[in-house]
Each structure stands twice: as structure tokens, then as C-alpha cells.
Amino acid sequence: MIDIKLIRQNPDLVKEALRKRGEDPATIDEILKIDADWRTTITKTNELRSRRNEISKNVARLKKEGKNTEAEALIEEGKRLGEEIKALEEKEKELQKQLNDLLLMVPNIPHESVPVGEDESQNVEVRRWGEPREFDFTPLAHWDLGPAWGLMDFDRATKLSGSRFTVMYGKLARLERALINFMLDVHTKEHGYTEVWVPHLVKRETITITGQLPKFEEELYLAERDDLFLIPTAEVPLAALHSGEILEEKELPKKYVAYTPCYRREAGSYGKDVRGMIRQHQFDKVELVWVTTPERSFEDLEQLVKDAETILQKLELPYRVVSLCTGDLGFTSAKTYDIEVWLPSYNAYKEISSCSNVTDFQARRGNMRYRRRSDGKLEYVHTLNGSGIAVGRALVAILENYQQPDGSVRVPEVLVPYTGFEVIP
């Protein structure tokens, strides 16, 4: 949620930010109209309350002086004021709800360093690492390799759950688990993250804090009986962990890592990446979240990206980093880097991590603040999030980039201590 003060004081700046995102700036005019009405209603209510308090004092004085007729007249006026105040309080409450509902639909303001563009075609490549492998044989896609070994089963997954699910057996199941443990070890032992085990079902308020609600409810799985949502990413419980709390500056930054399955309906992605494991309704991910101060959050974002890159470098998988343009930014993000791994089956780089600084957007929704060391002033924290990394896509990248002419796949050296084997199958 962006600061209403920013909209009041600099509406043109906010409108321009929305235009750069490809959003309709008319929402801001609607917000300003309701906000003005809301503030006028508050002022009028306070004036009537003040008048009613004055009447109460005068009634007591007049009764003491024996002027009962005048006192009765004031009592009647006080009753009328009470009814007006009640009506205004109801109006104030309704306007506040309308205002809050609209504010929840306004995306974050892009940082000045974000390239301006309409869609992903205008994202800007920042750097590359490694070179895509040149095969001296025709490489197979992961959706051909896995089933050929009898270790990846899309048909039975469809029988169990419908499309966009996968069953894996034996060495592939162990490779998935090895990747999870490897990533957690790197981030906790080398990068200083605290590992967190989080719930996979969260309250409506929690997932509103992190920005998935109210705008993207159709993309979420909901357990209706208990009104609990399956998490689309561990960012949700991690970023909301300190909601309603005041932290001390000396505690920051807090760096959290969590492994969870993630659940997404993918309602808006019909027809995209329908083959294999690239776009699933359920997938594993290791997530990184920082809680930090405004002064250092963009510097911390650069470090977060490097932490995610380390995983791909250790796995020796070629990748590139791109800075998302304004039109491709996520709803909550002020700045995002995507890390894209090379996949031979697509002959292209595909996203394997998305790292974002959402500034105080989530902190305002969740009332997450910290006390400044210098003056004791309370300020909103900044939160960052990033995949460190998507496990299923890492497995896919290994299968496709490490395949051999005989149809086998060599396991990356760093994973052998975790898998206990060097070759698949």
C-alpha cells in the first residue's frame, strides 16, 4: 500500500508512475475525491462533537441556575446533534472502507532506476554468467528424458490431480530433495540466513499484507471452510512474520530462508509452458526474505540477487540477470531483477528466480515498523524477497544441460554428497 500522503501531496507523480506501469491513473482522482469527502466528514463530525460537549456543560450550568426551560431546549438540540453525529460516523466509516479498498488496488511506485517499458520485451539485460552448452548430439527436453527413464510421470499425476502436476520416482525424487538441502545449506552456512519453517495455509489478512489480495484472489487456492489460503510462495508467511511489531534498528537486517511447496492456480496462464515441469500448480521453492531499513534496501537487493546467483554458479548452470521494466513489474515491487537459466529445450533463458524490493509497500499494510537508533523515531521497514531458487526449474535445468549422448544425465559435482550418486538413471 502506498502512502496516502504521497497521493495527496504529489498526485501527478503517482499518476505518472501508474502510466509507466500501464495502469489507469483515473483511480488516483477517485481516491482524492473520496479522501476529501472523508476528511470533510471527520472535520464536521468533530465540530458537532465539540458543540455537543459545549451543550452538556451549558445544560449543567442552566440547571444549577434553575433555568430549566432553557436547559430542556439545549437537551433537545443535543439529541438532534447526537443523531447527526451518528449518521456522520457511519458515513465516515463507509468512506474510510471505500478509500482503503481503492488504496489496496494501487501498485507500488517504480524506483527511478527501473527502465521504462511496456512489457517483458523491454526488460534490460544486466549481465550473463556461463555459456550455453553446444551439444554434439540432439539434446532431449526434460519431458522426454524423465519419462524415458520411468522416473518422471505426468500421466499418473494427471490421473491423481489433473493437469500441471508431476510425480517423480527414485533418483529424480532424491535429486529434488538434494537440491532443497543444498540450497538451504548454502544460504544458512555461507550467506547468513536464518532458516524458518512456516505454515503453508495462511489467513486472509496475512496474504493481504503481502499484496496477493484483494487483486489476485483468482490465482490462489482457498480452503473455503476455514477461509485459509494455500501459499503461492513462502514470501507470504516470511514477509508478514513481523506484522504489527516494532523492531529495533540494531536487529536489522533480518534475513530469512524457507523451503516450501508453492501452490498457484495459474488462472491467467492458459496455454503457456504446458509441457513438462516449467509451469506447475504445485512446485518447490527456496525463498529468501529480508527485513531492512529504507536507507540500505536497494543495496541489500543487489546482495539478495548475488545470493540467488551463487546457487546457479555452484551448479554451473548458465544464466542471465535482467532488470524488469515498469510495464513488467509485479504489483508490489518497486524494483525487480529476474534471473533466467538457460534451457536447451526452449533454446532460451527462462526465469528461475525473481528478486524484488517492495520498499514499505507490505510494511504499511502489515504495520511493520522499526525504531531508529539515532532519534527513536518509528519508521516503516522495507521488505525484499527473492527465489533462492525455484527447485523444480533447477532440476529441469540440470537434466537438460547435463545430459549425455547415451541419454543419461551427470549430476553436478556439488550435489553428489547430497544425492549419493553421480549419474541418472
From Swiss-Prot:
Binding positions for ATP per the UniProt entry: 264-266, 351-354
PROSITE patterns, per the entry: AA_TRNA_LIGASE_II
Keyword line: Aminoacyl-tRNA synthetase, ATP-binding, Cytoplasm, Ligase, Nucleotide-binding, Protein biosynthesis
Highest rank taxon of the organism: Bacteria
Keyword Aminoacyl-tRNA synthetase: yes
GO molecular function, one term: ATP binding
Pfam family, one: Seryl_tRNA_N
Leading EC class: ligase
Catalytic activity: tRNA(Ser) + L-serine + ATP = L-seryl-tRNA(Ser) + AMP + diphosphate + H(+); tRNA(Sec) + L-serine + ATP = L-seryl-tRNA(Sec) + AMP + diphosphate + H(+)
A single GO BP: seryl-tRNA aminoacylation
Record keyword Aminoacyl-tRNA synthetase present: yes
Subcellular location: Cytoplasm
Pathway: Aminoacyl-tRNA biosynthesis; selenocysteinyl-tRNA(Sec) biosynthesis; L-seryl-tRNA(Sec) from L-serine and tRNA(Sec): step 1/1
Protein role: Catalyzes the attachment of serine to tRNA(Ser). Is also able to aminoacylate tRNA(Sec) with serine, to form the misacylated tRNA L-seryl-tRNA(Sec), which will be further converted into selenocysteinyl-tRNA(Sec).
Name of the protein described by the UniProt record: Serine--tRNA ligase
Origin species: Thermotoga petrophila (strain ATCC BAA-488 / DSM 13995 / JCM 10881 / RKU-1)
Source lineage: Bacteria, Thermotogati, Thermotogota, Thermotogae, Thermotogales
